[in-house]
Amino acid sequence: MHIRILGSAAGGGFPQWNCNCRNCRGVRDGSVAAQPRTQSSIALSDEGERWILCNASPDIRAQIAAFPALQPARRPRDTAIGAIVLLDSQIDHTTGLLSLREGCPHEVWCTQMVHQDLSEGFPLFPMLSHWNGGLRHRPIALDGEPFAIPACPRLRFTAIPLRSSAPPYSPHRGDPHPGDNIGLFVEDLDSAGTLFYAPGLGEVDEALLEWMRRADCLLVDGTLWRDDEMLVCEVGDKLGRQMGHLAQSGPGGMLEVLAKVPAARKVLIHINNTNPILDTASAERAELDASGIEVAWDGMHIQL
């Protein structure tokens, strides 16, 4: 299984266009040892020819430009993107569909709740129906059964409902439903390599831990270092848990969770611009290094 990190930042990217926090200011003027990042998205492939896009970032055009394997190479108009999987209906995970309209029709796999949000609150499905057939919805069931996507037939996907939040525009933002957010457990039938992918993760219970323990590689929510980070940095008024993100530090935080899991690789993705782990010289980054936890970067390639 080939895993390409197309984008590793949370919504807004890094640096965020209107943010003057220490990290964003520092990456612009070179005073912080950090590299810019686009908004979170990955691509998966079984053989490296056809790819499945997991979430469609607003930065998708730049991400394709940085990854030749997704670029047109066989016909005058062409793409190696064989399908798109949406793990939620967040703006920073779906807006890229607008930039992919010239390649319609696209197979878009998502839960019924995500499809509802993208048909009503942020109506991408009806909007894009005017472009060559638009988006063809392929439902993702929440029954725990593995499913295959024809573009990469040697991969098996299992959707895992997560405790997180629907996007702010959703009519059930404050009333969570199963399927608002999912994680993916992905298995390569040939190599037997396994991935657990959850860029938006608000809570980890024992059942979810069991899925995480089965994975060779964890690619999980790295949004915030501390739950009150947005308030401390004076860039927001919400706690991480109110936004559906489990902070890395503190009791029950992601560091404690990952310490319970034997995966060979533990990688944080969807990293907010305020998070001190973006600074490679920070004490927080040193703590991750000492724990064997990696920080995803744009262009990172993992093979399982």
UniProtKB/Swiss-Prot annotation:
Transmembrane spans: none
Gene3D superfamilies, per database record: Ribonuclease Z/Hydroxyacylglutathione hydrolase-like
Transport among keywords: yes
Functional pathway: Cofactor biosynthesis; pyrroloquinoline quinone biosynthesis
Keywords: PQQ biosynthesis, Transport
A Pfam short name: Lactamase_B_2
Gene Ontology biological process: pyrroloquinoline quinone biosynthetic process
SUPFAM superfamilies with a match to the protein in the record: Metallo-hydrolase/oxidoreductase (SSF56281)
Family: Belongs to the PqqB family.
Role: May be involved in the transport of PQQ or its precursor to the periplasm.
Name recorded for this polypeptide: Coenzyme PQQ synthesis protein B
Organism per entry: Pseudomonas aeruginosa (strain LESB58)
Name of the gene encoding the protein in the UniProt record: pqqB
